Amino acid sequence: MAYYKKPFTPKKPVRTFRDLEVYQKTMECAVLISKDIAPALVKQKYPYAERFAECALSVPLLIAEAHSLRFADFALGVGFLEKAMSASNKMIVYLEHARGLCGSKLDQSLIEDIVGRYAVCRVKMFHLEKSWKRFRSEYDDDKEKKGTGGFRY
């Protein structure tokens, strides 16, 4: 029987969206893409280079918006988190497409690393969504109609 060997350390409380691990990790990916991959794609005349860079930055942007909106309109906040998960999937598709088209002209290990990071972040965003929903039901926010302000964006 295997036991978890690392000592337990509680996570730092989340005060802003910048404290969310999924925000931090997807921002790291966006920086790596803008710095290392996007210029190489422009050189190779990759047809979707601009969309590629925009999509990379959209993931942390959507996470930040979701974190803020969940207090005003919970359903809208969760919807933005769903969009962030979708954008993570899109980034994996863009990265694999670029790797297929450009091949050895791109850093294959970097692309594989970023694909793995996006896949892990996608799962963590799903767990974050479940956590938000659990928190909402534990504190009876759904029964008291908190977060249903009909927020329009």
What are these regions (language model features)?
Residues 1-153:
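Amphipathic alpha-helical assembly/interaction segments
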